[in-house]
Amino acid sequence: PAICKFTGFSYPMRGKSLSFYRGKITIKMEYTKDFFEKVFSADRMKKYFLLYPGDEAKAIKHYQCNIMLSEAMYPCLSVFEVELRNSVVRELVAFAKREDWYVVFSTTPGLMELNKYISTAKKQIAARGEDITTAKITAELTWGFWTSLFNRNYERILWKDLRRAFPFVKKANRQRKVVASFLNKFRRLRNRIDHNEAICWNLDEVEMIHDEMMNVMGWMNKEVPTWLSQFDRFSSVSLDIRKIMNW
């Protein structure tokens, strides 16, 4: 193995060459199918190698592009989740007429089932030895909870208030089922990314979801998409992937 020495540290590197660039060392490594199957499991990698029989290099590139695409979605996902949560909480406070809005779930017919999310959040906070506050409960609740508020089961009770969380939505889209459809689509993509699942199989679809998410952000606040676009790298990463994969 080659020995890489840098800033007082030595460690073995199994690679083909070392090169220097602006004071940094770039290690050019050879990674094979065996490496990826060992690190990420043969089952996870199977779909990639089956897609490119006889071309391990392209299969590996595809897997790496999946990681790149997942990483590039995080700014949009994280901003959307926080914006949605805060917009919805504002309307739930108005609905409940109290800051600890979740308290009314346990006594409101039709909403009692939602109390299970609140109980779970409280248990998780208590398990960390922290004080249970409204802010911490709000932060602890999952995307699944926020999305569930737009289910058909709660339309009669909640929709007339929750629709005000989207003051800039066009009239044609000002329907619970439209909002719920988008939120569930975003949640499914987010869950796949969080569980390191494949999302880079239909790049057109992921690009569409990213655009839809930016659009729905604008339904809540017109300025958020403009602000996020200043540092969101999704479009450039997506373009890079198309070049890498020759798509």
Roles of regions detected by a PLM:
Residues 1-181, 185, 203-247:
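Extended intrinsically disordered or low-complexity regions, especially N/C-terminal cytosolic tails and loops
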